[in-house]
Amino acid sequence: MKKAYLQECPPVLREYLGYTETIKGRSGNTVDEYFIDLRTFFRYIKQIRGLCPAAAGPDENISILDVDMALIRSVTLNDVYEFMNYLKTERHNTSKTRARKTTSLRMFFRYLTDYKHVLDVNPVQNLDTPKQKKGLPQYLTLDQSMALLQSVDGEFAQRDYCMLVLFLNCGLRRAELAGINLRDIRPDHTLIVRGKGNKER
């Protein structure tokens, strides 16, 4: 997790994020996303509860360092649904983004109720996930793929060509490709790729 984010974390949130990274084995990027989602939520809660000065300005300026168990215990399912509405209407978040934030909230409150036992009732236990549009995957035709490979030029043409071949033939994610090191290339012409959750594939 980024050090800058740690400095913004109240103790309860710092403990949770440490747990997800060290015990649950989530990647640093995933933990950062959890933090951003929870920070957005608690900034919203502080705003609707009148717990931040009017002069604070945009919610990006609202500190969550003072978020404690008393505030967390006051959260209701209705608060969360209003937050989801705020994300859609004010922040124009897509259903996919809202679904991720729903997951972040579910995991945090489950941690507090089932693991830490500091909450008697999980306010998001019955939280519905925003419905997501499911579209067909987009792909390049063979001609488009060939044209893309033929367009590679410049000082790093060989590297770029190899990267495109891996993208096209292996279906790698961007982070998976960026994470490949020389030691991942084996003498038997195979490649180890570390996927989400640091899983080898």
Predicted features along the sequence, with ranges:
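Conserved catalytic core of the tyrosine transesterase superfamily
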Residues: M1-R201
